[in-house]
Amino acid sequence: MLPTSVSRSLYLKTFRSHLLRAPQIVLKRMSSSIDISKINSWNKEFQSDLTHQLATTVLKNYNADDALLNKTRLQKQDNRVFNTVVSTDSTPVTNQKSSGRCWLFAATNQLRLNVLSELNLKEFELSQAYLFFYDKLEKANYFLDQIVSSADQDIDSRLVQYLLAAPTEDGGQYSMFLNLVKKYGLIPKDLYGDLPYSTTASRKWNSLLTTKLREFAETLRTALKERSADDSIIVTLREQMQREIFRLMSLFMDIPPVQPNEQFTWEYVDKDKKIHTIKSTPLEFASKYAKLDPSTPVSLINDPRHPYGKLIKIDRLGNVLGGDAVIYLNVDNETLSKLVVKRLQNNKAVFFGSHTPKFMDKKTGVMDIELWNYPAIGYNLPQQKASRIRYHESLMTHAMLITGCHVDETSKLPLRYRVENSWGKDSGKDGLYVMTQKYFEEYCFQIVVDINELPKELASKFTSGKEEPIVLPIWDPMGALAK
């Protein structure tokens, strides 16, 4: 019998104390193999339960997502009325297809609103492929640098094994987007689109790059172990490897048409059917037309494992050598919600990261944690957000854009949000989703706002230079890359 709630704390403390001192034989007594005789007993018990019989009949004939969908709840939550929205329509609906570029789409979709407004355009996209190309190139080089800096660790160490797992995966973080734009700028998609196959279906390309990078990792670690290998040898090896990675990339993608400081010419037609010509560079286009000041955006997260009001840094996570580290400010959900409202009121969309597709109905475009009636089959989910993070049940997997919300007049908090995804117009309702506040609280992990939109006490966390961040290892769930 489990202890009462009154004695639970003392019980757990005593249990842990005994467990730490327990010899192996005691631990062995606690193991439990499957008792075959109990299987028949369990089966008879469940077969005599009419509720269980009904549930198993349905689930053996239908997809669980279809069978358990609460359509009454769905109809109630599928409300597309929003009283706080950005003024510019974000068109066309974008589609990352079979690639993990959601973070690049969400970030460029946020900035394209500025271009649409600035140039009086009906439709526009920034080139996601342009950033994708350089992200791959930079990530490969960043990986090689991490291999060199971790050469003192055993090949079987958790760090080295983690680095080797996915050296150039598609996913990323907003700070990694900023690192790319600072170095390479932005260009219109008209100049560099998604035509190469591997841009929109990157699995095989990633596999080949990963294989080559693991080979390079062994070469570097072997060279570093040889006492005769001085710095110049490693530098030469690195340059040879960079060249080979670039060669491989040029096989799968076109080389971007311009250098960051090289001028390009772009012709376009505005809403009034007037033809215009722009001469600009990628770096100038990012600042002049996309209106991006890379020093302004900051990331905030909700991680209930750690104290609120603290900076959190992810060790070794990045893409561009010498670029900014991945740093967040940890805040409560109410603060996140209020900042979303404030930013939307400033006519700016909100980049956010969530655990997708948890509790997301792709057919109708509704995100709600009560959308499926799992309790009807006795399947309950009692874990809280902090526990889900600790036990690898929840993490940020996808980035999207909040372009509107419906604010309650009394609480001044959102009741629901309008979400722009990057899975094409056939996902959700013409590419748009409605997300409930409860979903936001449970499965939203990150938002990006401008530092001047923060209260002074929060902004100072980033600017004072006095805040020592909590440093989490690269494999921590908060270091997950949105795809």
UniProtKB/Swiss-Prot annotation:
Effect of G479A: Results in the abnormal cleavage of 3 C-terminal residues instead of only 1 during autocatalytic processing
Active site: C102, H398, N421
Biological classification of the source: Eukaryota, Fungi, Dikarya, Ascomycota, Saccharomycotina
PROSITE patterns reported for this sequence: THIOL_PROTEASE_CYS, THIOL_PROTEASE_HIS
Catalysis performed (reactions): Inactivates bleomycin B2 (a cytotoxic glycometallopeptide) by hydrolysis of a carboxyamide bond of beta-aminoalanine, but also shows general aminopeptidase activity. The specificity varies somewhat with source, but amino acid arylamides of Met, Leu and Ala are preferred
Species, as recorded: Saccharomyces cerevisiae (strain ATCC 204508 / S288c)
Note: Present with 521 molecules/cell in log phase SD medium.
GO biological process: homocysteine catabolic process; negative regulation of transcription by RNA polymerase II; proteolysis; response to antibiotic; response to toxic substance
Gene3D superfamilies: Cysteine proteinases
Propeptide residues according to the Swiss-Prot or TrEMBL record: 483
pH dependence: Optimum pH is 7.5.
Function text: The normal physiological role of the enzyme is unknown, but it is not essential for the viability of yeast cells. Has aminopeptidase activity, shortening substrate peptides sequentially by 1 amino acid. Has bleomycin hydrolase activity, which can protect the cell from the toxic effects of bleomycin. Has homocysteine-thiolactonase activity, protecting the cell against homocysteine toxicity. Acts as a repressor in the GAL4 regulatory system, but this does not require either the peptidase or nucleic acid-binding activities.
Protein name stated in the entry: Cysteine proteinase 1, mitochondrial
UniProt PTM: The N-terminus of isoform Cytoplasmic is blocked.
Coiled-coil blocks: none
